[in-house]
A protein has these predicted regions:
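Membrane-embedded catalytic cores of phosphoryl/pyrophosphoryl-handling enzymes
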Residues: 86-177
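Hydrophobic alpha-helical bundle signature of multipass membrane enzymes
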Residues: 1-98, 106-127
Length: 177
């Protein structure tokens, strides 16, 4: 059947209009863009460390697997970031040019699912504001992260890996204390 060009064009127009709005607001404030980008990185990293070290270490596998799959999807989709169409000076703290899917959104959504703290959801919003991601990148990434979490949980629960890993890790920690 193929892709529906009308839907794709409408979605792109929505993406474009939202990004254009933020570009107009921030185009002369690149220092603010840098600060906002730094905040989004700090929020995501702090939640990852909190989850791994204070909630459950085995979630590290969820983050590693989701990051690897996301990276592969970025290579396959090869979608350009919004700043590419507006102003390349917005390419602050960007290591590659692929927009889809949004790793920040996936990490933030997984962190929200695990902790229930809504504060972490500011990271994907900030990535849209600073022209690092299209709105559709973030929306699809939310769905993708829910799929990652459900798949990870079902695999660990089905095979009983979760409990045996926690017991092993607790013994390892006690042994070296």
């Amino acid at each position: 059947m193929g892709k529906n060009p009308i839907f794709i064009n409408k979605m792109f127009m929505i993406d474009y209009k939202i990004s254009e709005f933020f570009y107009r607001k921030l185009r002369d404030r690149l220092n603010l863009v840098y600060i906002i980008d730094t905040i989004s990185h700090i929020v995501n990293l702090s939640f990852i460390f909190y989850i791994i070290f204070f909630i459950n270490f085995s979630y590290i596998f969820l983050f590693i697997i989701s990051t690897a799959i996301t990276y592969l999807l970025k290579l396959i989709s090869n979608r350009k970031r919004p700043y590419y169409y507006f102003d390349k000076r917005f390419a602050i703290l960007v290591y590659e040019n692929h927009s889809f899917p949004s790793e920040h959104t996936i990490i933030a959504t997984l962190s929200f699912i695990i902790t229930g703290n809504i504060l972490v959801l500011i990271a994907p919003i900030l990535r849209i504001v600073t022209l690092k991601h299209w709105l559709s990148d973030a929306l699809f990434s939310i769905i993708l992260s829910i799929i990652f979490y459900l798949f990870f949980s079902s695999i660990f629960n089905f095979f009983g890996l979760f409990n045996s890993f926690i017991i092993w890790f607790d013994k390892l920690i006690i042994k070296y204390e």
